[in-house]
């Protein structure tokens, strides 16, 4: 009788659970994974080279398009690298706004992860629940930047503008009654800060709903417990960061270990796992949402009592006011030169990283003294996590590969760059 051999299966890049354009070549013995070989590059856009071809202040938008679920956190690392090279002092109010939106972004990312991860393993309802809250936070993005995704809100020296005094409201439509419209606009009568304050007050109830749906659900536990186990020591060797590292029991978080912005002035805890499996990583991310909610609450309280500037007064990076440009030729020239030629950084190199929702997102920037970088290297957390796919999937069933892709929380915008 002929010997039965392993067979090869192409998973993706059109698979709905591939989270973008992942192509996995799976070597399978029956239904057990013997080898998983990720093929990347299908979303490569040459971002690093594009950033090197434009003035520093024209490349902020490229950062949003890396991990397109965690937009403002990407911007923060790039902006901090430029500010460190320029030696600019950022106003405290701008720092608090940045931290608040970093944490809003973290919740946005984790809600997207929770909804899609649940959908991947068969929990349909959680997707709808997660997007209910996500919509409110996307509205906060829209209120400050005009964009629901690619905000380009952070600028070297501060932020684009202060928080608006009026929250945008839903308009009358033939699809909704006056009563429905009134209910939808109930918490939008005040400022953006009032809206966020209302959100952080109600959000713990939403997290409890997610908990009730999933945490003790026996099918959810059967699909996640003991799947994709990575020990603490092995996680460090593989270069894991963020929830992937903390899920293995390592309490490493840049917000605590290497504080930036105003994180050292805020109170929050770092959740860690025990066994390093997919279920532990789920619990870590759930607790991270609670901690982010607590941080946002502290930021809102501080911002409500401390008005002030949100942009540095350094004319090298700060554009003139729109009203000044209407009647002052020098202001018009200043604006034109700033947004066409940008500014030059002194020669040198810098690495700045932030605690991104997926891990350590870093920017390594080399300047040769020109108005555009000589070299930019983007350290994407998902790249190291995907590299461990073979190790995490080996010995598991084919259906568990979907769980492992979900627990890694990979987005190909940052991996392929």
Curated annotation (Swiss-Prot):
Homology family: Belongs to the complex I 49 kDa subunit family.
Compartments reported by the entry: Cell inner membrane
Gene3D superfamilies per record: Cytochrome-c3 Hydrogenase, chain B (1.10.645.10)
Membrane-topology descriptor: Peripheral membrane protein
EC number(s) stated in the UniProt entry for this protein: 7.1.1.-
Subunit: NDH-1 is composed of 14 different subunits. Subunits NuoB, C, D, E, F, and G constitute the peripheral sector of the complex.
Keywords assigned by UniProt, alphabetized: Cell inner membrane, Cell membrane, Membrane, NAD, Quinone, Translocase, Transport, Ubiquinone
Function: NDH-1 shuttles electrons from NADH, via FMN and iron-sulfur (Fe-S) centers, to quinones in the respiratory chain. The immediate electron acceptor for the enzyme in this species is believed to be ubiquinone. Couples the redox reaction to proton translocation (for every two electrons transferred, four hydrogen ions are translocated across the cytoplasmic membrane), and thus conserves the redox energy in a proton gradient.
Full protein name: NADH-quinone oxidoreductase subunit D
Source species: Ruthia magnifica subsp. Calyptogena magnifica
Catalytic activity: a quinone + NADH + 5 H(+)(in) = a quinol + NAD(+) + 4 H(+)(out)
GO molecular function: NAD binding; NADH:ubiquinone reductase (non-electrogenic) activity; quinone binding
GO terms under cellular component: plasma membrane
InterPro entries hit by this protein: NADH_Q_OxRdtase_suD, NADH_UbQ_OxRdtase_49kDa_CS, NDH1_su_D/H, NiFe-Hase_large
Cross-referenced PROSITE patterns: COMPLEX1_49K (PS00535)
Domain of life: Bacteria
């Amino acid at each position: 009788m002929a010997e039965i051999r392993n067979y090869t299966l192409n998973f993706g890049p059109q698979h709905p659970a591939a989270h973008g354009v992942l192509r996995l070549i799976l070597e399978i013995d029956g239904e057990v994974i013997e080898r998983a070989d990720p093929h990347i590059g299908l979303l490569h856009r040459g971002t690093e080279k594009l950033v090197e071809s434009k003035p520093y202040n024209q490349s902020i938008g490229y950062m949003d398009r890396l991990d397109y679920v965690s937009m403002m956190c990407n911007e923060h690392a790039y902006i901090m690298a430029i500010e460190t090279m320029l030696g600019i002092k950022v106003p405290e109010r701008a720092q608090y706004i940045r931290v608040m939106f970093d944490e809003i972004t973290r919740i946005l990312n984790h809600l997207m992860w929770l909804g899609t991860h649940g959908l991947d393993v068969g929990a349909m309802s959680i997707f709808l629940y997660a997007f209910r809250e996500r919509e409110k936070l996307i509205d906060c993005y829209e209120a400050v930047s005009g964009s629901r995704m690619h905000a380009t809100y952070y600028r070297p020296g501060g932020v684009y503008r202060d928080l608006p005094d009026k929250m945008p409201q839903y308009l009358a439509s033939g699809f909704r009654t006056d009563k429905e419209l009134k209910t939808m606009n109930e918490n939008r009568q005040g400022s953006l800060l009032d809206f966020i304050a209302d959100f952080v007050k109600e959000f713990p109830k939403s997290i409890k709903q997610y908990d009730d749906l999933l945490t003790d659900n026996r099918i959810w536990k059967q699909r996640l417990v003991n799947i994709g186990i990575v020990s603490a020591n092995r996680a460090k060797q593989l270069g894991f960061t963020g929830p992937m590292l903390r899920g293995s029991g390592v309490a490493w978080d840049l917000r605590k270990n290497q504080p930036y912005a105003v994180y050292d002035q805020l109170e929050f805890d770092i959740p860690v796992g025990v066994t390093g499996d997919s279920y532990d990583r789920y619990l870590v991310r759930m607790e991270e949402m609670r901690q982010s909610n607590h941080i946002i609450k502290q930021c809102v309280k501080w911002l409500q009592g401390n008005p002030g500037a949100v942009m540095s007064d350094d004319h090298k990076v700060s554009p003139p006011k729109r009203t000044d440009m209407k009647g002052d030729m020098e202001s018009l020239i200043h604006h034109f030169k700033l947004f066409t030629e940008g500014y030059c950084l002194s020669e040198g190199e810098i690495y700045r990283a932030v605690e991104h929702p997926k891990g350590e997102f870093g920017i390594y920037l080399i300047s040769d003294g020109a108005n555009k970088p000589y070299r930019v290297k983007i350290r994407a957390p998902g790249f190291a996590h995907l590299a461990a796919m073979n190790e995490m999937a080996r010995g598991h069933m084919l259906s568990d590969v979907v769980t492992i892709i979900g627990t890694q929380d990979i987005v190909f915008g940052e991996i392929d760059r």
